[in-house]
Amino acid sequence: MRYLTAGESHGPSLTAIIEGIPAGLTLHPADIDHELQRRQGGYGRGARMSIETDRVQISSGVRHGKTTGAPITLTVINKDHQKWLDVMAVGDIEETLKLKRRVKHPRPGHADLVGGIKYHFNDLRDALERSSARETTMRVAVGAVAKRILAELGIDMLHHILIFGGITITIPSKLSFRELQERALHSELSIVNPKQEEEIKTYIDKIKKEGDTIGGIIETIVQGVPAGLGSYVQWDKKLDAKLAQAVLSINAFKGVEFGAGFDMGFQKGSQVMDEITWTPTQGYGRQTNHLGGFEGGMTTGQPLVVKGVMKPIPTLYKPLMSVDIDSHEPYKATVERSDPTALPAAGVIMENVVATVLAKEILETFSSTTMSELQKAFSDYRAYVKQF
């Protein structure tokens, strides 16, 4: 399985082409639209999300609600493009129109300046448009297809926010996977403690009035993955490493950890290793899950626990100092449309990116020309692991 995305933030549309999806997977536009709508939600989103109503168009690879095994083409129209027809025109335009929305004051924390240097851009909009988080629309769309595969194999997942700006979410003890999932899904903030909703919303409103932004830490949990996905035989086959690369590729993500993560640097080995158990009904298990479901780059059969840290959005309505790329004089950075926080949306993106990596690993590990073939191979492997 592989995919490419294309499109600019204010261009006509966004596109993804996915190759390697088995034939016979039930797939409807509504499956993808559901995830796209989740990405657009969450408290603290800005004006752009009130303009766009993301809906996918499937133009290949699906017929009568079933995948055919051919490449799948997904497209999402950018409604806002109608206001940018001159600025984002494909053909040449008058010089005065080119200057209309030219970006020459790069924003600290964005790809503007370095992208302009690398690709020799006189107008930093050429970097800004593609590096925008709008691209993640299509990674969510691809992830929605991946989640359909995982669902057919009995794999489920959730995400929730652990830290919202400077506020740590208190996680009620002994919540099941399903309870965590339901609480996060029904929260505008993707948190599992409803008692903290108003406190955080008030904080977001304050940050917005100040023209500032906040980041935080997101946790994704995956249930139902058997032991043995990934490999220790080469560095680039380790599944946790693949997940780390994918999570860090999400806009504004600056760190990733698994299970207890960086806290393990302060503990002894006897405190963090997950002792092995075995029962006739369940097979192998673990007393704990400090390692987040991974050993040696392979899944252990425990829930996968992946955490990502998102920096505050770098576009500020109270802009920081920058430099004019023409005169090299100090200037306030360019202001583009932005949100005080996009943590709930980033959680949806992270969840779908993780789903894509897992689906790809499964499709490369098991016979997968058709879904029925994949389901049988996966079921047989589960049975093997249980009796090992």
From Swiss-Prot:
It comes from the Bacteria. Pathway: Metabolic intermediate biosynthesis; chorismate biosynthesis; chorismate from D-erythrose 4-phosphate and phosphoenolpyruvate: step 7/7. GO terms for molecular function: chorismate synthase activity; FMN binding. NADP(+) binds at R39, R45. GO terms for biological process: amino acid biosynthetic process; aromatic amino acid family biosynthetic process; chorismate biosynthetic process. FMN binds at R130, S131, S132, N251, A252, G296, K311, P312, I313, P314, T315, R337. Keywords: Amino-acid biosynthesis, Aromatic amino acid biosynthesis, FAD, Flavoprotein, FMN, Lyase, NADP. Its cofactor is FMNH2. Its EC number is 4.2.3.5. Reduced FMN (FMNH(2)). The keyword RNA-binding does not apply. Signal peptide: none annotated. It is an enzyme of class 4 (lyase). It catalyses: 5-O-(1-carboxyvinyl)-3-phosphoshikimate = chorismate + phosphate. Pfam families: Chorismate_synt. Belongs to the chorismate synthase family. HAMAP family: Chorismate_synth (MF_00300). PANTHER family: CHORISMATE SYNTHASE (PTHR21085:SF0). Homotetramer. This is Chorismate synthase. It comes from Streptococcus pyogenes serotype M1.
